[in-house]
């Protein structure tokens, strides 16, 4: 081989090697963050790059409404990112589809497990295997107008007494307002009674505890303390106009509260008829996942681990206004003294992860129909029996698919 040809061969080898090294140091990450969350996450990604010289993290913000479909269509075909961030409600479906999310038990050590609020890691677990690390969570809690409510109610008896005092239908004022026809919101009451959607993987919407919870809701409706049309727009309007003393909602509601409205947050009340147990909302947990087709799995997991550590979680909490799953964050005075962050942490301690099984997608429509008929006086047993029959049929059809 001539010296010239040897030089060309060597240059070619070095070019290939160099390209390989460059690719090995590049990560593509998809997320749906906006505004302050987006800015905080970008800061965390830059910090990761600084900690790993030669590493490049490319972030792509995907509109939330299109995000799930984009993951479903692109990731299994190897056309997606190395890491993506999404809530756990689609986790089971993507795992069953295959080639979408990489299991991470192989990487996960005990110190990393221990950094999280246990139920948030539970939300990342499917059939005993962990598939993501939890970034943050969302739950509904009690939000009250301090001009109308001096001390938030701790029990349902206190809540009803307060709501009766504040309610004046003629003036369009209500003591309590929340989206009680929405099954997601109703779950907090249902869970207080020990209700559930599945037993050992089988749908059980018409179980006795679910019926009791629905009967209890009907009592609140008959008391006249709730608006008849509980749309989110109406609830926001009532609260901002000083016509709702208490609402049940999540962190998304806080951004809709008008300037000048003095509000506070507190735990959802306990329910005497449920044995004094607290209302237990469903929590949705946003996880960071390694895409199964990624050729940079080790680096991708390293990034996922970094963005969920305590330093990153502090940035996401203080600057991004997220409620992190990393429990060490709440030991920091900046977070512990923050009314919003402290209140949601207290609420998540009694919350239940929303089911992440693929069958859950078949629950929403029949459950919503049942809720809409029950709030108009239909027997909860009859309404839930009908919903159960539909969900059982749909689930059976799903499981017959090849």
Question: What is each of the regions a protein language model found here?
Answer:
Residues 131-135, 140, 158-203, 209, ...:
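Extracytoplasmic/periplasmic solute-binding protein
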Residues 251-264, 269-369, 398-400:
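C-terminal lobe and pocket-closing loops
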Residues 81-82, 111-144, 175, 276-280, ...:
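A structural signal for short loop-to-beta-strand junctions that line the ligand-binding cleft
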Residues 162-163, 201-229:
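Glycine-centered hinge/linker elements that transmit conformational signals in sensory
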Residues 40-44, 155, 209-216, 286, ...:
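Short amphipathic alpha-helical coupling segments at ligand-binding clamshell hinges
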Residues 8, 22-98, 110-113, 233, ...:
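Conserved N-terminal structural module of periplasmic/extracytoplasmic solute-binding proteins
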